[in-house]
Curated annotation (Swiss-Prot):
PANTHER family: GLUTAMYL-TRNA REDUCTASE
Family: Belongs to the glutamyl-tRNA reductase family.
Enzyme class, spelled out: oxidoreductase
Molecular functions per Gene Ontology: glutamyl-tRNA reductase activity; NADP binding
InterPro entries assigned to the protein according to its UniProt record, in alphabetical order: 4pyrrol_synth_GluRdtase, 4pyrrol_synth_GluRdtase_dimer, 4pyrrol_synth_GluRdtase_N, GluRdtase_CS, GluRdtase_dimer_dom_sf, GluRdtase_N_sf, NAD(P)-bd_dom_sf, Shikm_DH/Glu-tRNA_Rdtase
Record's protein name: Glutamyl-tRNA reductase
Binding site for NADP(+): G186, A187, G188, E189, M190, G191
Record site: Important for activity: H97
Name of the gene this protein is made from: hemA
UniProt cross-references to Pfam families, sorted A to Z: GlutR_dimer, GlutR_N, Shikimate_DH
Organism (species): Campylobacter jejuni subsp. jejuni serotype O:6 (strain 81116 / NCTC 11828)
Pathway(s) it belongs to: Porphyrin-containing compound metabolism; protoporphyrin-IX biosynthesis; 5-aminolevulinate from L-glutamyl-tRNA(Glu): step 1/2
Catalytic-site annotation from UniProt: C50
Oligomer status and interactors: Homodimer.
Superkingdom field: Bacteria
Amino acid sequence: MYYCISFTHKNTDIALREKLSFSNEAKKSEFLKIISTHENIEECLVISTCNRVEIVAFVKMACAEFIVKSLALLCDVDKDILLEKADIFEDSGAIHHLFSVASSLDSLVVGETQIAGQLKDAFAFAVKNNFCGVHLSRAVHSAFKCAAKVRNETQISKNPISVASVAVAKAKELADLAQKKAVVIGAGEMGELAAKHLIAAGAKVIILNRDLQKAKDLCERLGVLSEYDSLENLKKYLNQYEFFFSATNAPNAIITNSLIEELPYKRYFFDIAVPRDIDINENENISVFAVDDLENVVQKNLALREQEARMAYGIIGRETSEFFRYLNDLALMPIIKAIRLQAKEYADKQLEIALKKGYLKKSDKEEARKLIHQVFKAFLHTPTVNLKHLQGKMQSDTVINAMRYVFDLQNNLEGLNQYKCEFDMENNDEIY
């Protein structure tokens, strides 16, 4: 069954999410290797962003305690706290949740489109490292299709919003950004988003980054309203400008009290990184906004999008039902094929016995074979038609299991692999 354990802005604070975050691929790979050794876990992947950690798996039976214990040991967190906080989804609930995540209905900012790329990256990593097979591939591919339908049939992603844009929106409430200079620390995806929104608001941006070439490349994409410098000069900029947006992947805070000088004007720091980049004291001239502090702005956007979200959830519900109908169809067709193949094998076997015992002349073999095959085809016609009529119906699972038992069919039916997942496992760059 499909299985999902979820830690998000809805059930954890930023301090806990910092500890759970997978800031590098080595940590993610280590965790997936650990949990994939469990006898009940067949496939798994991890989605890790500033607002969520999602463990998505295909399992034989529920194993939340093992997964959470493994996560707790790796991240040095109390297992009982994680079990208390975790949202756990099974089967249709897990698929509905995955589709909601992919469609940005579960995001801090509903309608933001970053999550699709983050899911794509998580999936590609799992496929590349052999943690993900046909079951999760089908689920993720269907999640992308659902997300596309939500975008195309609702207005929820029009004028897309991200945590970075919410931070800039908050800055615009505090001051007119036109002609001001804002410092963006970090040249990654979140830093680039913040810079784009700042430029759209009329500000000029300064990009600070450890890798100067990456900062230069970003400025070339941004255009004339940007410049760049090394992160080594951070202190100089911190004590020269008013607005700072920090979005690095540093494991610890990079902006601390030791770098801050007292100045006679207000400065605003927006920490949009997880783990947090900023650890300074606030006072009348220094204000710090972390991811969780942006909730008020987020709520305004949620109110505007409430109707679109209701429509989107309707789509997700229908797509979830359609996904399980699709799985039932995949299961039924191999059953039909296996029963017919079994009948053919028994008929051929009995024909050979009849020939050996002299019940039939060898010259009559082919005519007898045709007759026998016509008989079993006629006999199986009505069961085959009735099985096909079950496709997409609730009772199909019960019938499938009964047919497997009655005809002694193996769990991995011959022919199942012909139902190729739409995701090409050999070309995992063609995911989305």
